[in-house]
Regions:
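Alpha-helical scaffold segments that flank or form the walls of functional sites
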Residues: 38-54
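A generic local secondary-structure boundary/capping motif
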Residues: 1-3, 11-14, 49-52, 85, ...
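Active-site glycine-rich loop that binds ribose-phosphate moieties when present
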Residues: 111-121, 156-177, 250
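Glycine-/charge-enriched secondary-structure boundary and capping motifs
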Residues: 69-94, 101-108, 178, 185-314
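Short pre-catalytic strand/loop immediately N-terminal to key active-site residues, enriched for Gly-Thr
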Residues: 37, 156-164, 182-183, 253-257
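Acidic-glycine-rich active-site phosphate/pyrophosphate-binding loop
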Residues: 12-23, 166-172, 237-248
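Glycine- and other small-residue-rich loops at beta-strand/loop junctions that grip anionic moieties
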Residues: 2, 99, 125, 136, ...
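Glycine-rich anion-binding loops of enzyme active sites
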Residues: 16-33, 38-41, 57-153, 192, ...
Length: 314
């Protein structure tokens, strides 16, 4: 066992030989958009992301389905499954089957098995003092999804969030591999602050980030100001606040955005200063949605985060 659950990492990694290791993960959730096909795409991309965060490539998947068969037609489920299958195919993975149950609320996701060379595993314990922190997607999907459920999200915000959530992290993982990245995690349900904190704790380091350097989706600040904040995001902020020192200039809305629970978020990468420019160039070349240096890893209390109000590291 190369990676287990003890470090709160994104997936398990099991060595099979000197040249090959398996990556195993699973994820599923309820719909966050209205369109069934798009929901399937997002759920699949979200599950596949854990394999990319570990430096691997997906091979096989199993569907996980909960469906209210007496309330919603099965052809609608077919659209969910089509979205998932086509997204898995884009990742080079095959869906081999799965399991479904009758459920009062629809749910969909995947079990994913991938592979990685044992010497090329990226983990959330790989950050080192001096590393630059790079984010590969804008944040804010939780806020937009909450606004969608209330019918309050504008077309531009919906389009931007949907594009982000349906984008695979494969190209970002390729760029990370090219730059020799060893520290990585994907930003999902615990938000940027939560996943960064877990990475820092696992690595035995602390970090300083700049709120203004963190990319965010179109219209997120306005939607957050209007109160479209999920309960999970508030819990994320409560938890993160125990180990995070915020610049007094950052208001509660800004802090909530940084703690926003993400779905199919980007990769958070820790890269050496010497390789930071190579990584951001590779991300740009691979057409990553973002290639933002948002902070620096440092020595100090493991898991401790300092958030500055500036727009860039100084």
């Amino acid at each position: 066992m190369l990676v287990d659950a003890s470090g709160r990492d994104d997936a398990a990694v099991i060595r099979l030989s000197a040249e090959r290791a398996l990556v195993l993960t699973t994820d599923f959730f309820t719909p966050i958009v209205d369109d069934a096909y798009t929901f399937g795409q997002i759920a699949a991309a979200n599950a596949l992301s854990d394999v990319y965060a570990m430096g691997g490539r997906p091979l096989w998947c199993l569907n996980l389905v909960g469906w209210p068969r007496e309330k919603l037609p099965l052809d609608l489920l077919g659209e969910v499954l089509r979205g998932g299958a086509e997204t898995a195919a884009r990742a080079g993975a095959t869906i081999l089957g799965g399991h479904s149950i009758d459920d009062p609320e629809p749910k969909y996701g995947l079990v994913v098995v991938g592979e990685v060379h044992p010497d090329r595993v990226t983990t959330n314990a790989g950050a080192r003092a001096g590393d630059r922190l790079v984010l590969t997607k804008p944040i804010g999907t939780g806020i937009v999804a909450t606004a969608i459920k209330k019918g309050a999200a504008g077309a531009d915000a919906v389009a931007a969030a949907t594009a982000a959530m349906t984008t695979l992290n494969d190209r970002a993982a390729d760029a990370a591999r090219e730059a020799g990245v060893r520290g990585a995690t994907d930003v999902s349900g615990f938000g940027l602050l939560g996943h960064l904190g877990a990475m820092l704790a696992a690595s035995g380091v602390s970090a300083e980030i700049w709120a203004g350097a963190v990319p965010r989706l179109t219209g997120v600040r306005r939607l957050a100001e209007e109160g479209h904040i999920a309960g999970g995001t508030r819990r994320n902020l409560d938890a993160a606040s125990r180990t995070t020192a915020f610049d007094p200039a950052l208001d509660e809305v800004e802090r909530l955005i940084l703690a926003d629970a993400q779905t199919s978020g980007g990769l958070l990468l820790a890269v050496s200063p010497a390789s930071a420019a190579q990584l951001t160039h590779a991300l740009t070349s691979h057409k990553s949605l973002a290639a933002a240096i948002i902070g620096t890893v440092s020595t100090g209390d493991p898991g401790r985060i300092t958030v500055r109000a500036g727009s860039a590291p100084t």
